[in-house]
Amino acid sequence: MKWKMRKCPKDNIYTFKDTCQICGSKTVIPHPSRFSPEDKYVKYRIELKKGITLNC
């Protein structure tokens, strides 16, 4: 899905452009990813978040 609304991480300003109009930095998508109870990659995201390596 293509998101239209974007946010500058430095200025906390919302825009529709890929770069911030004030500071010129790259904007990010402020929306969280969708949740699925049947997510195959949940353990890898938890591993990245906690900084722990899980041996599969």
UniProtKB/Swiss-Prot annotation:
One GO cellular component term noted in the UniProt record for this chain: ribonucleoprotein complex
Keywords, alphabetical: Ribonucleoprotein, Ribosome biogenesis, rRNA processing
Q: Where in the sequence is the signal peptide annotated?
A: none
**Per UniProt, what is one GO molecular function of this protein?**
snoRNA binding
Q: Does the keyword rRNA processing apply?
A: yes
Q: Which GO terms describe its biological process?
A: pseudouridine synthesis; rRNA processing
PANTHER family, sorted? H_ACA RIBONUCLEOPROTEIN COMPLEX SUBUNIT 3, RIBOSOME BIOGENESIS PROTEIN NOP10
Per the entry, what this protein does is: Involved in ribosome biogenesis; more specifically in 18S rRNA pseudouridylation and in cleavage of pre-rRNA.
Q: Which family does it belong to?
A: Belongs to the NOP10 family.
Task: Tell me the NCBIfam families matching this sequence.
Answer: PRK13130.1 (NF009623)
Q: What is this protein called?
A: Ribosome biogenesis protein Nop10
